[in-house]
Structure formats: structure tokens, C-alpha cells
Amino acid sequence: MKRMIALDGAQGEGGGQILRSALSLSMITGQPFTITGIRAGRAKPGLLRQHLTAVKAATEICGATVEGAELGSQRLVFRPGTVRGGDYRFAIGSAGSCTLVLQTVLPALWFADGPSRVEVSGGTDNPSAPPADFIRRVLEPLLAKIGIHQQTTLLRHGFYPAGGGVVATEVSPVASFNTLQLGERGNIVQMRGEVLLAGVPRHVAEREIATLAGSFSLHEQNIHNLPRDQGPGNTVSLEVESENITERFFVVGEKRVSAEVVAAQLVQEVKRYLASPAAVGEYLADQLVLPMALVGAGEFTVAHPSCHLLTNIAVVERFLQVRFCLIETDGVTRVSIK
């Protein structure tokens, strides 16, 4: 019988990533875990609908036995079974992030007994989670280099707070892994600005694009008008394609915040990325830790290791026999596996 791993949900950044990573790793390794103080670092601690959906999804996919799977719970015991491929559908029932639920269960399905399709309904454009286009255009091409083949499709947008979006991912079991080396970003090839609108006047998008174009030389400027019933909502994105990597940054518009202010937030984030020679942005760094650990080798550079990144590494090291090495050099942090 495998040992029970005890986790403190208040460690590090104290958010939902500790739980999501633990669920992924438990399904992959077969190691049970207990976690207390779930989301202790948040204003509203305990399991929200998004986190509960992730727990239920993990439970269904591997036939786990669970204690504490209810809204508001700050303690969970998870004993995994065998991961099985298949066609799965999960509904969050709020504008909680579809991609964060997918992020929880897809790594386990890389090791399933056959191909799978997972569809999640909920929020797709959430200020605190990566949108589907980030997964599709940034993360999945890097996963393919590692040997992980999955394809995400955004079927319907769902903006916060209404939700109603749908995202689906098809995934195949991994045949073999390759090592990912992302030490250098390389020269910038092109930059693309994009605005999504649903039930919001077009002049908002035009002002946001103008703000981006005032700071960067954009090779493409795209405005996409979505059906009104998918809103109201507005997302501004800027994609930076470099020789070795494509990064994508986004900001979700808010009521009573001007188009210029929304776009200026994105400009500042992209400028921070470009000010460092690091290959990987802060949010992508979080996404690369688990697949790199499963490979057991590889490296990437990031400008600064976030608390989120350090917390994720700490959880991964509890489940897998790997140790990460972080070395600051020439204004970047090089993250590798010893």
C-alpha cells in the first residue's frame, strides 16, 4: 500500500494550484494524499465550484475514493484508482475556469489506456486563469515537442461572471518523452494584437488596439465580434512570436474600467516580459513544471520565480523523485532538474 502524502494547503501562495497539482500527481503515481487548509491564502477559503469540479473529474477518471468533496471544504482525502481513457463531460455550474479543470485531469490522461476527450463547461475568459487560446497556441506546441499530444478547442466563450462557455480537449497517451530546452527566447519574429468582444461596443476594441499599437509594432491587429449571448465580455491579448517560443499575454476587461486602462495593463505586462532575456513568462513557467518533472530532465528561463511557481515545484517534489534547481544568472532564473 502506497504511503499517504500530507499536504498543507496554506503553504506558499496558498491557492488552488496546490490541490490541482496534487490531484494530477496522485492520479499519475497512484499515491493517495490528504490536504488541509485548502485555499487558506484566499479571501474565501475552501473548495469553490471550480475546485470541486476538478475533484469530481479526477474521481471519475481514475475511480478514486474521496472524503471532503463538498463546497467550502478545507480538507480533502483522495485515494486514486486506475486512470481510464474515455469521453468525459464536466460542468462547473459557474464562471469558474474550464482550463484549470482541464489542467488538473489531462496530465493523468497522458498515461491512460487509450485516447480521451474531455469537455468542460464554465468560464473561458477569467482574469485569474489561462484562456483556451493560451493553452492552444502557447502550451500545446511546447507539449508536442516533449511528446505530449493534445488538442484544445474553444467551442463557446463564457465570460466572468456569467460563464456558459465550453472547452474540449482531445488527448492521446504518450508513447515517449523528449527533453525541452528553453534557455533562450531568440529574436522577436512578430507581434499580434487581438480583441474579443461580446455585447460590447466595437469602439472599445478599436481603442484597445490603438493603445497596443502605440507601444508595439504589431504585424496583425484582429477584432473578433462574438454573439451577444456569449457576453457581455471583452478580452485583450498580445502574442509575441520569437525564434524559439511563442508567448501570449491577456487582460480581461472590467466594468467601469476604460479601454485604454485595460490595454495599458497588458502593455506593462508585455514590457516586463521583453525587458528580460528569459524565454518563458511567469504563467507559462507554472505550466511547464509538471511535464518537465515527468520527463525527468529539461530547463527553461524565467525573469523571476513567482510564489506560484515555487509552490508548484514543492508539490511536485513530494510526489516524484525529482529535484528542481533554480539558479539566477544574467538577470534571469534558470529552472532545471538536477
Curated annotation (Swiss-Prot):
Q: Which SUPFAM superfamilies match?
A: EPT/RTPC-like, RNA 3'-terminal phosphate cyclase, RPTC, insert domain
* Reactions catalysed, as given in the entry: a 3'-end 3'-phospho-ribonucleotide-RNA + ATP = a 3'-end 2',3'-cyclophospho-ribonucleotide-RNA + AMP + diphosphate
Instruction: Mention one GO biological process in which this protein takes part, according to its record.
Output: RNA processing
Q: Which InterPro entries match?
A: RNA3'-term_phos_cycl_insert, RNA3'_phos_cyclase_dom, RNA3'_phos_cyclase_dom_sf, RNA3'_term_phos_cyc, RNA3'_term_phos_cyc_type_1, RNA3'_term_phos_cycl-like_CS, RNA3'P_cycl/enolpyr_Trfase_a/b, RPTC_insert
PROSITE patterns given for it? RTC (PS01287)
Binding positions for ATP? Q103, Y283, L284, A285, D286, Q287
Alphabetical GO CC annotations of the entry are: cytoplasm
Q: Where in the cell is it found?
A: Cytoplasm
- Disulphide bridges, residue numbers: none
Q: What is its EC number?
A: 6.5.1.4
Q: Where is the active site?
A: H308 (tele-amp-histidine intermediate)
The UniProt family comment states: Belongs to the RNA 3'-terminal cyclase family. Type 1 subfamily.
PANTHER family xrefs: RNA 3' TERMINAL PHOSPHATE CYCLASE (PTHR11096), RNA 3'-TERMINAL PHOSPHATE CYCLASE (PTHR11096:SF0)
Protein name per Swiss-Prot or TrEMBL:
RNA 3'-terminal phosphate cyclase
